[in-house]
Amino acid sequence: MDRDRTTGWMEVICGSMFSGKTEELIRRLRRARIARQHTRVFKPALDERYSEDEVVSHNENSVTTTPVEAPPQIQELVQEADVVGIDEAQFFDDDLVPTCQALAEDGHRVIVVGLDTDYRAEPFDPMPQLMAVAEHVTKLHAVCVVCGAPANHSQRIVPGEDRVLVGATEAYEPRCRACFEPEPVTVTRPRPHTEALRAVATDDADASTNEADPEAADAASADGTAA
């Protein structure tokens, strides 16, 4: 594709589950649309937790998306988008890295979102490689449902050793380093204030992003729909 513009760039938004990653992607996309930029959003076809054709945050904000089976399809479908969003990047294979590099070099702003570690707290490919080559990396934290500290781990609370287990509150909960257990644990009943802590996690994610990025804070003020 021959684009009459300067080289684009890559942004990575990472963190544990329930840290507000998808919410932050939606906020940045809304800001781009306010600036009259054309956006396209993609996600892995296997992610059907909330909708087949939308990216949906855990608090149910959403944007229309295109499910794809493999990263090269993104290059085929992106067309003239100024901003390309890619959610749940950890579910793609390593082809996502050269795909994102090519998109950025072709003039697109590429926003990649995903878990940086799996349920064993091990780096979740291809996220480490994407973080290494991105111009901007934002790491968000949830709130530990056990003690209330900042959480950077996704604790699996259902049986199973498969690395990929698509789920939400029924399968995972955010935990801090001290409360995290590398093996799945069984939670037989909801913890006190769990939903409140998850709501705070999203608020804290927005606040920490704005503190680190004054431009993002200005955008949040300008966009009345931002979370």
Swiss-Prot record:
GO biological process: DNA biosynthetic process; thymidine metabolic process
Residues annotated to bind Zn(2+): 144, 147, 176, 179
Signal peptide coordinates: none
Active-site residues annotated for this sequence: 88 (proton acceptor)
InterPro entries found in the cross-reference section: P-loop_NTPase, Thymidine_kinase, Thymidine_kinase_CS
Keywords: ATP-binding, Cytoplasm, DNA synthesis, Kinase, Metal-binding, Nucleotide-binding, Transferase, Zinc
Reactions accelerated catalytically: thymidine + ATP = dTMP + ADP + H(+)
Region of interest called Disordered, as start-end residue ranges on this chain: 198-227
GO MF, one example: zinc ion binding
A GO cellular component annotation in the UniProt record: cytosol
Superkingdom of the organism of origin: Bacteria
Broadest EC class assigned to this enzyme: transferase
Biased composition (Low complexity): 217-227
Subcellular localization, as worded in the UniProt entry: Cytoplasm
Enzyme nomenclature, EC number: 2.7.1.21
Binding site for ATP: 15-22, 87-90
Alphabetized Pfam families for the sequence: TK
UniProt record similarity statement: Belongs to the thymidine kinase family.
PANTHER family on file: THYMIDINE KINASE, THYMIDINE KINASE, CYTOSOLIC
Subunit and partners: Homotetramer.
Name by which UniProt lists this protein: Thymidine kinase
Species whose genome carries this gene: Salinibacter ruber (strain DSM 13855 / M31)
Gene name as annotated: tdk
